[in-house]
Amino acid sequence: MNQLRIVVENAWEDRSQLENRVTQSAIREVVDMLDRGTLRVAEPTENGWIVNQWIKKAVVLYFPIQKMETIECGPFEYHDKIPLKTGYKSKGIRVVPNAVARHGAYISKGVIMMPSYINIGAYVGEGTMVDTWATVGSCAQIGKNVHLSGGVGIGGVLEPLQAAPVIIEDNSFIGSRCIVVEGVHVESEAVLGANVVLTASTKIIDVTGDQPVQYKGRVPARSVVIPGSYAKEFPAGTFNVPCALIIGQRKESTNKKTSLNDALREYNVAV
């Protein structure tokens, strides 16, 4: 592993090494390991999530060493550098026609892919549903038993290297047409109602107490979140700016599905 990292780091500093077959082989091995789930762009530790920047470098370097190839699927034709993921049956993944995942994305057993898209470097945990027209961007990290509802957009990130990927932790529910980008971290068992938009600068305001509590870039565990707005002064007057409101907490329960249904009913959250 350390040798792979050294080769990638050297090629990052000196792009002429991309002509070297040993370098190309090392980069492709890193992408193959991402595809198998033996490497991850980001991973949880006892001290929080860490981002493996050298692996992101390998993904970026993978593009210039790949040649364009035509891919034919029945009457459809594609022309790209990155091969498609294969072997879904042996991996225990259900894939509905028109769903697409790129090689270099790890998809665990029990995942259901409706017509959707998962990009290179992404990680999707066991039992997760990727619903119709949902997209999982490059290097995004999706936990176990997550529900990405129809039209959800999970942002990807390759560059800048220091930028963190979007992280959606285990048992979270992301409602229809939600957008989560710019390295936002949604902690375990959170519920985002339909149309919530979260960027790195979006104010996430907990309104459940006597005084509002503001977060940015992070949704605390088990939070129930809906779209909101707040007044902001501009030269032309006062206007409402979008934000996200934490309106309650999903109750802890060993039965996560029951807990989710209760939260949706209790807070009248559109999904």
Segments predicted by a language model, with ranges:
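Terminal amphipathic alpha-helical/low-complexity segments used for targeting or macromolecular assembly
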Residues: 1-93, 222, 227-271
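Structural signal for interior beta-strand "rungs" in well-ordered beta-sheet cores
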Residues: 93-233, 246
